[in-house]
């Protein structure tokens, strides 16, 4: 059961997404800061991306590997969390182990503590821990960037042809440096594009999309979509349209 407050999250949360300094941009995709205020516990659904995250919350720092499916985070009372989203592919040197070893896990931070996290304070710590350049990490990050930039890449075979590396080479590279397989990353970004189209009011041919993404049937596609987004494609689309209608009503003349 989805929390009825989900559509009203802006009344309870404030989000900031500062960009990293240029010297840290090869490692950090973005920072994220969330402030919240709830009078009773709220289960926040988190949709997965292929990023490793460093989070500072309540005096505790943790590192979360890539999640293979959506997860929930409980927010209660008034609080704040400061997070670092690392670029996909670059975290292995910080971790000192294959990134797949922390997939679907949250572990204590291996970085020095930051009692009062802010962009300058966290960047000072990150600079003190920068690893030596790793050509394999650069390669992995570049392959993920190519997936993001090329919507026509819908299968691992197409990615292999695009990069000149075999599917098994890509599997090993992603397990070591990204933490999850190339098929998952491809499907994740293609599904993100679908949700963007839904947000714009477009209708989606689910059966055709499932075939384009290499699913044997629509049922398997629905299963994976639900694992990522916490609801079926049709349920997700209906909720999006409900939110759009609410926003239009709120913005209409005489609505306030």
What are these regions (language model features)?
Residues 1-167, 177-182, 196-200, 205-216, ...:
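Alpha-helical bundle regulatory/interaction domains
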Residues 174, 186, 224-226, 237:
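DNA major-groove recognition helix of helix-turn-helix
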């Amino acid at each position: 059961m989805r929390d009825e407050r989900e559509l009203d999250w802006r009344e309870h949360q404030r989000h900031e997404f500062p960009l990293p300094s240029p010297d840290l941009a090869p490692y950090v995709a973005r920072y994220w800061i969330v402030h919240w205020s709830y009078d009773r516990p709220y289960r926040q659904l988190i949709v997965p991306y292929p990023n490793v995250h460093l989070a500072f919350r309540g005096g505790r720092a943790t590192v979360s590997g890539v999640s293979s499916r959506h997860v929930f985070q409980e927010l209660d009372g008034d609080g704040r969390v400061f997070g670092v989203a690392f670029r996909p592919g670059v975290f292995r040197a910080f971790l000192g182990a294959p990134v797949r070893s922390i997939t679907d896990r949250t572990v204590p931070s291996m970085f020095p503590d930051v009692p009062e996290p802010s962009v300058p304070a966290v960047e000072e710590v990150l600079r003190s821990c920068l690893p030596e350049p790793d050509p394999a990490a650069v390669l992995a990050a570049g392959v993920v960037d190519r997936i993001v930039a090329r919507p026509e890449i819908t299968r691992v075979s197409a990615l292999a042809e695009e990069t000149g590396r075999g599917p098994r080479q890509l599997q090993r590279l992603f397990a070591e440096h990204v933490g999850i397989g190339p098929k998952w990353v491809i499907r994740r970004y293609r599904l993100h594009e679908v949700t963007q189209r839904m947000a714009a009011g477009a209708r989606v041919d689910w059966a055709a999309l499932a075939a384009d993404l290499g699913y044997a049937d629509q049922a398997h596609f629905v299963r994976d979509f639900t694992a990522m987004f916490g609801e079926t494609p049709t349920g997700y689309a209906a909720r999006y349209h409900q939110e759009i209608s609410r926003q239009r009503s709120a913005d209409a003349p005489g609505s306030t």
